[in-house]
Amino acid sequence: SSTETPPSYNQLNYNENLLRFFNSKPVTAPVELDPPKVEPSYVSSAREDAHRTLSPVQGFEGSGGTGSSGNFTTGSNLHMSSVTNTSNAGTGTSGTGNSGGGGGGGGGGGPGNGAVTPVTLTESLLNKHNDEMEKFMLKKHRESRGRSGEKNKKSANDTLKMVEYSGPGPGPGHGHGIKRGGSHSWEGEANKPKQLLTLNTGGMPPLLDIHTSSASLSKCQASGAGGGGSGSVGGTGNIGSGGSNAQPSTNQYAQSGLSCTQNINLWPPFSVGITTPTSVLSTHTAVAQSSFSTQHNLFPTFYYIPASIAASSPSGTSPNPRPHKHTLVHKSAEQPSTSQAAAATMPLQYMTGLMYPHPSLFYTHPAAAAATAMV
């Protein structure tokens, strides 16, 4: 990118120097073991480098009457001193010199006597060489970065195409770990009962398949839900009547010996007119076994609204039920009224509209209570 600091000339030239050094085939053995091959190898490698690397001092012309432009090549920095300048002394037409990577150079042919005049390396000439080489290396660096950027962009586009191909549906292309609109998450399960609450505002879901105590349950629904619907925060008469009528029907339901594991995927709907949780508890106590079946991915909590103590006192002092063999059902059915009475005696502990997930405020399902008792 344009904001990053470009690499320095030494960093850019590092790989180039290594490549030139090893391409020159340096002789690491002592010179006395193989003296004749030293000079030709360096001269030939320097000529090969001339075709690959351009030197900025290539256009420098040697001085002399018949001398033409010198052929300057770039050799290895490490062996610059060992490379000799060769010229045709007889004719004096041209000379072949070697300049180092740092800017060293050889001289052109003399005016006829074959004398080699070395070129004076000025600071401006070296700076010019370094500037041009730096521009050349930066250009190569940008080209390499551009190629890598295009590859990354292409791979990103391929990834986007794969995601689009997978689609949002739960089909064979459905990806894992990505939440989409069509996925069945716990949030969707929690929102289903809320959407269905508007269908039944009468007080209880019509999902009871009971023959023996259907009449008593319908009476309980009519009295409890009706009382809760017309009750207010200070209205104690209607709420009390709903609570007192709910308990005997609970006993009849418990004595009937019916199955309590009916699977209903609805919370008990809250009526619009209900302002206190007393009528809600007294209403759903009668069929708590049916409406409060095990709900997956749901957290059972209650909203507590401050109410007067007299409003919930009838439900707190419910009559003792007749003894029967379903002791677990009786205990679980009695628990909401007990917790409600405890909550009503301390109305200032809870703030309006807040949810308090305290263990004592939960309603225990009979199956869960039986499992806990067995453990």
UniProtKB/Swiss-Prot annotation:
Keyword Nucleus in annotation: yes
GO BP term (any one): entrainment of circadian clock by photoperiod
Biased composition (Low complexity): 69-91
Organism domain of life: Eukaryota
Biased composition (Basic and acidic residues): 145-156
MF (Gene Ontology): transcription cis-regulatory region binding; transcription corepressor binding
PTM statement from Swiss-Prot or TrEMBL: Phosphorylated with a circadian rhythmicity, probably by the double-time protein (dbt). Phosphorylation could be implicated in the stability of per monomer and in the formation of heterodimer per-tim.
Residue numbers spanned by region Disordered: 28-118, 140-189, 220-254
Entry GO CC: nucleus; perinuclear region of cytoplasm
Assembly with partners or alone: Forms a heterodimer with timeless (TIM); the complex then translocates into the nucleus.
Protein task: Essential for biological clock functions. Determines the period length of circadian and ultradian rhythms; an increase in PER dosage leads to shortened circadian rhythms and a decrease leads to lengthened circadian rhythms. Essential for the circadian rhythmicity of locomotor activity, eclosion behavior, and for the rhythmic component of the male courtship song that originates in the thoracic nervous system. The biological cycle depends on the rhythmic formation and nuclear localization of the TIM-PER complex. Light induces the degradation of TIM, which promotes elimination of PER.
Name assigned to this protein: Period circadian protein
Originating species: Drosophila capricorni (Fruit fly)
Organism lineage: Eukaryota, Metazoa, Ecdysozoa, Arthropoda, Hexapoda
Gene encoding the protein: per
